[in-house]
UniProtKB/Swiss-Prot annotation:
One of its GO terms (cellular component) is intermediate filament. Pfam families: LTD (PF00932). This is Lamin tail domain-containing protein 1. Belongs to the intermediate filament family. It comes from Macaca fascicularis. Keywords: Intermediate filament. Residues 1-22 have a biased composition (Basic and acidic residues). Residues 147-265 form the LTD domain. Residues 1-23, 361-404 are annotated as: Disordered.
Length: 404
């Protein structure tokens, strides 16, 4: 047996020498199996027949239904290693069919149309919500302009300043009374900025406004005609001032203001819009903030339309539940009641002066000690006054007995 083995080895060495002489470098291959699962379904492929039937080296299984198996050439190996690896591979493949995972169908690529747009700019629902919020803001701004208007005007009587032209061409007065005539003779139409008068126009005397009539004061730039008592041309004034800081006032001859007009600039309208939006934000407060300020367990009194899009579970957290308010009551100390007794019935060693405090604490131990000291300090000799009193008492008794 050993001779046969040596003979086979010699043959192999001779074959290697012949191949080296011919100069044809042998090319060997490594087979790598990487069973990477892409789909849930796998197909069986008997690779033993395909590999043993002379599969070309460097062949790559690129079938659309098969993936995970690659055969590549990496470097040069000896014939012994190649033969051993091939034989082992054939034995392992003949043992049973090889499971090759089927390639999963690729998902459609995002890059065209609406999907690509949404991938860049977000969900369409969010875009719709944002556009709705913008439309709501603009609509609210227009409502502010409609409600407030482009000016604020006030009056104390029936005469009002109806309009100050935006271009500063005229100022229009109106008599809002339906049946009264109003005299505006010698009245003053003036414009003030920061409390200082910048222009002043005095009406002609004996000017009367009929009921529901208008009077217009034109500036020189309007090139209007002077037609009293309805139209007056102010030649000295090129244009009226229309800035937001300018107030147009109609005064009586004595200087009392009876009507005034203030234009509203678009910036002021935006400021009002900002304040209203900020107020709406404050009205929808987080639960922790309301709990801190008002000591409520949950918060919000108003829910905007944006909040209504949330599920009902989130909205239920914003229900108002007012907690009980507890008032801290201080404990009252009851007044001390003094005993209804005469101070002369007390201990003779306690002061009986009416201004002396009777509730002053007294230590009994010290009082007892004082009594003992006083008893010790008393003299042992008898009291003469008491002896005389007893003698006189006995004598009186004897005299009464004798008289009987």
């Amino acid at each position: 047996m050993q001779n046969k083995v040596y003979e086979q080895e010699d043959k192999m060495e001779k074959q290697e020498q012949r191949e080296d002489k011919l100069g044809t470098p042998p090319v060997y291959s490594l087979v790598h199996f990487s069973p990477k699962m892409v789909g849930s379904v796998a197909t069986t492929l008997p690779l033993s027949s395909s590999l043993s039937s002379g599969m070309p080296l460097g062949y790559h299984l690129s079938s659309p239904q098969i993936s995970g198996v690659t055969i590549s050439t990496t470097g040069q190996l000896t014939s012994k290693a190649t033969a051993g690896s091939c034989s082992r591979m054939e034995n392992s493949l003949d043992a049973g069919p090889f499971l090759v995972p089927k390639k999963q169908d690729e998902s459609p690529m995002i890059g065209d149309g609406e999907d690509y747009f949404l991938s860049l700019f977000g969900d369409s629902k969010k875009l719709i919500a944002h556009s709705k919020h913008t439309q709501k803001t603009l609509k609210y701004f227009s409502m502010i302009l409609e409600e407030v208007g482009q000016f604020t005007a006030s009056s104390l009587g029936d005469i009002e300043i109806a309009e100050v032209n935006v271009k500063g061409l005229f100022v229009k007065l109106i008599n809002s009374s339906l049946d009264k005539e109003m005299a505006i003779g010698d009245h003053i139409l003036q414009q003030n900025v920061n409390g200082q008068t910048i222009s002043l126009y005095r009406f002609l005397p004996n000017i009367v406004m009929q009921a529901s009539s208008t009077v217009t004061v034109w500036a020189a730039a309007s090139e209007a005609k002077h037609q009293p008592p309805s139209d007056f041309l102010w030649k000295e004034q090129d244009k009226f001032r229309t800035s937001p800081d300018c107030i147009t006032i109609l005064c009586k001859p004595n200087g009392q203001a009876i009507a005034w007009y203030t234009p509203i600039h678009w910036k002021q309208a935006w400021e009002k819009l900002d304040t209203d939006i900020e107020f709406n934000r404050c009205s929808v407060v987080s639960p922790t903030f309301r709990k801190h300020v008002f000591q409520w367990t949950a918060s919000t009194t108003t829910i905007t339309k944006e909040k209504q899009d949330q599920p009902k579970e989130d909205i239920s957290n914003y229900q108002v539940e007012q907690a009980q308010v507890f008032l801290k009551r201080e404990k009252e100390i009851p007044p001390t009641v003094f005993p209804n007794r005469s101070p002369w019935c007390q201990n003779p060693y306690v002061s009986a002066h009416p201004y002396c405090p009777l509730i002053e604490p007294r230590n009994t131990s010290t009082a007892g000690g004082n009594l003992d000291r006083q008893s010790r300090s008393q003299p042992t000799r008898p009291n003469r006054a008491s002896e005389k009193f007893t003698k006189s008492l006995n004598a009186s008794k004897k005299m009464s007995y004798l008289w009987q």
